[in-house]
Regions:
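Active-site beta-alpha connecting loops in nucleotide-dependent enzymes
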Residues: 83, 115-185, 195
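Short glycine-/acidic-enriched loop or helix-start segments at secondary-structure transitions
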Residues: 17, 136-137, 168-169, 202, ...
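Glycine-rich phosphate-binding loop signature in dinucleotide/nucleotide-binding domains
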Residues: 66, 116-122, 206-211
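A glycine-rich beta-strand to alpha-helix segment
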Residues: 198-229
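A short, gly/pro- and small-residue-rich
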Residues: 4-8, 174-183, 227-234
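Hydrophobic/aromatic beta-strand patches that form the interior of the parallel beta-sheet core
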Residues: 6, 19, 125, 156-158, ...
Length: 234
């Protein structure tokens, strides 16, 4: 088409190249060499994963091509808190960091856990709430292998019971259905906690200073995260 194309990424032949990354808390600091040779540093505040670094690099590259203030953009990027329920930092108490994430599809689950494991935490604990009885029945059937491996990198996995979202229960379908899929796949530290009232006490027993807890799912598991932070701080 005759239009100029500018590439960005980690490869040496990119016009804008990400030179280095460093995990910082629940975020990632990175340095970027711009197409004109300048090097800028910035930080993704609370969304881990190289894909988020790549997104940040794209923004700074575009800013530079438009002739705008890249240094100011790099500074402001560090203040961006990200999207709600996407590695949403809820708080830290008792040396334990708690984040909340909407992931409920196996690809999202695996990507979120992988990004978390790249951060500077001792262990990563996932509290997962399955969403809808119909989805659990379907996903653990036709996507059994994908869900079985999605939690592989988590140090521990705790399954809550199913968030119904208004659906009637399906006989034989509970949070334990997910547990069976994951343990059959070989995860050594996965459990099912059927009663909601027991979830926070269980996570208090599991998490230790230096650990990260991710409350995960599309249901009301998000309400557990602040409760857990409160209890950790007592």
């Amino acid at each position: 088409t005759g239009r100029a194309v500018t590439t960005y990424g980690f490869s040496e032949d990119c016009d804008a190249r990400i030179l280095a990354t460093e995990a910082q808390g629940v975020g990632t600091r990175f340095t970027l060499r711009l197409p004109d040779g300048r090097v800028v540093a910035s930080r993704i505040k609370q969304n881990p994963g190289l894909h988020n670094v790549s997104n940040g690099a794209a923004v700074l590259t575009l800013i530079s091509l438009l002739g705008l203030d890249v240094d100011l953009a790099a500074e402001k990027l560090q203040e961006f808190a990200g999207v709600r329920r996407r590695f949403d930092l809820i708080g830290e108490a008792g040396g334990v960091t708690v984040v909340d994430d909407y992931a409920h599809h196996p690809t999202e689950i695996a990507a979120t856990i992988k990004a978390a494991k790249a951060l500077d935490f001792n262990r990563v604990h996932v509290l997962f709430q399955p969403h809808r009885y119909s989805r659990v029945a379907l996903f653990t059937d036709i996507m059994r292998d994908e869900f079985g491996s999605a939690f592989d990198e988590a140090d521990t996995v705790t399954f809550m019971d199913v968030y119904s979202a208004g659906e009637a229960p399906v006989p034989g379908v509970t949070g334990k259905t997910f547990l069976n899929v994951v343990t059959d796949h070989g995860h050594p530290h996965a459990v099912f906690v059927p009663r909601r009232i027991d979830v926070v006490p269980h996570m208090l027993e599991v998490a230790e200073p230096g650990d990260l807890v991710i409350t995960m799912g599309a249901g009301d598991v998000t309400a557990i995260a602040p409760q857990l932070v409160d209890e950790l701080g007592r």
